[in-house]
Amino acid sequence: AFGKLQGTLTSQLSVDFELGGKTEKMPMPALINLRSHPDEATRRRGYEAENIAWEAVKETLVACMNGVKGETLTLDKKRGREDAIHASIDFARMDRKTLNAMLDAMKDSFPMFQKYFKHKAKLIGKEKLAWWDISAPMGKTDKVYSFEEARDFIVSNFNKFSPELGAFAKRAFDNNWIDAEQRDGKRGGAFCMGVAGVKESRILSNFDGSFDQVSTLAHELGHA
């Protein structure tokens, strides 16, 4: 219930935002996608508007999180589990050893990520990155992908790695497993979920034509 409340609340959030000389109600998914806008001033305004929007509903979102975590802790206690990570491990169909190996690999990679962000800051003329610069695009491009172009790009590159994976991605597109449209009332972000009854997956994304969203779509198909 608390998870559904969080999803319903965040999907209805919108802010008045000026873009291209025109002020409109912008849903949160579209606002979040401005993190990769080529103009720094637009990225910063989007970041600040996003924070203001979250601030307005922070008490409800905190209550949702406490409700979800409280339920998990109660169930773990009843089941005699040591900590709250077990529910997430079970949901992901993995064991603790695999999780620890993944976390260790991530920690080992921290210096590489730090080096990348320092170099990115240098390339855009800064000593260090502001939060609104983390997803800033590198270089300049006017390319905007249609959904069909994104599909062809993903399937083609999946095929280079594995024809089986490419065929699977094509099946997902052909059978409309993907809800990619940005619209009012839709939750932000992207995710993939399995549908056990039909042994298929369904994917949510908020596709805006950017390469970042093409990459996100490919990422979620990897989960499928």
Please state what every model-predicted region is.
Residues 1-97, 101, 105-108, 156-157, ...:
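His/Asp/Glu-rich acidic catalytic environments and adjacent acidic regulatory segments
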Residues 46, 53-54, 58-62, 205-206, ...:
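Structured ligand/cofactor/substrate-binding pocket environments in proteins
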Residues 85, 91-164:
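A metal-dependent hydrolase signature that marks the N-terminal structural subdomain at the beginning
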